[in-house]
Design a protein with these regions (language model features):
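Sequence context surrounding c-type heme c attachment/ligation sites in exported
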Residues: 31, 35-182
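Bacterial N-terminal signal peptides that target proteins for export
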Residues: 1-14
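C-terminal segment of classical bacterial N-terminal signal peptides
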Residues: 15-24
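Heptad-repeat coiled-coil amphipathic alpha-helices that mediate oligomerization/assembly
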Residues: 11, 17, 39-40
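Boundary of Sec targeting at the N-terminus
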Residues: 26-28
Length: 182
């Protein structure tokens, strides 16, 4: 009799266990199918000359100054290269502005000053940099005048407007090599 009770308990336990497993399996929701990725939307963004100058040149002008003030010549050289590349991108994006070819205009007005700033950076000469940068800034204003925008007046920065960037030299940091020209 004892065996019969034991067998009945085992059968009842097995049925209860099977019922709970089936219940759990039935109550677990099926995984949701993965959502399809949103389609790529290409915006009809047509930046103006002002947009590009504000995005590509003006911040680098200020960062170039800030880096040189900290005698971080590596960062200054980087910012100057980025500024040059910005002028190239602008001329490629907007080749003509009010019937003026921007590429040659940038070269004619800015090139000698950019080279002078580069020389000051290469020689790590703060006094030479200050003078060359003032001339570069004056060239910005000459370019604005040539493009009938004399009301846009650039100046040598008085303060650094980038509170989230440290312009000091970081000891032991090796700068990346200059990017290859395309």
């Amino acid at each position: 009799m004892h065996n019969r009770h034991l067998a009945a308990l085992m059968v009842a336990g097995s049925v209860a266990l099977a019922a709970s497993v089936v219940g759990i399996a039935q109550s677990a929701p099926a995984p949701a199918p993965a959502a399809a990725p949103a389609p790529l939307v290409i915006l009809d963004f047509k930046p103006t000359l002002s947009d590009l100058m504000t995005m590509l040149i003006q911040p680098r002008h200020q960062k170039l100054w800030a880096a040189a003030q900290q005698r971080n010549w590596t960062l200054a050289a980087f910012q100057l290269r980025e500024m040059r590349a910005g002028f190239d991108k602008i001329a490629a994006t907007i080749p003509k502005y009010i019937n003026i070819d921007l590429g040659p205009t940038f070269i004619n007005i800015m090139d000698s000053q950019v080279r002078a700033v580069n020389g000051a950076i290469t020689s790590q000469n703060s006094m030479l940099f200050t003078s060359a940068f003032a001339d570069l800034t004056a060239s910005c204003n000459s370019c604005h005048e040539a493009l009938n925008h004399a009301f846009l007046v650039m100046k040598v920065p008085e303060v650094t407007g980038y509170a989230n960037q440290d312009f000091r030299v970081i000891p032991g940091v090796t700068p990346p090599p200059p990017a290859a020209k395309k």
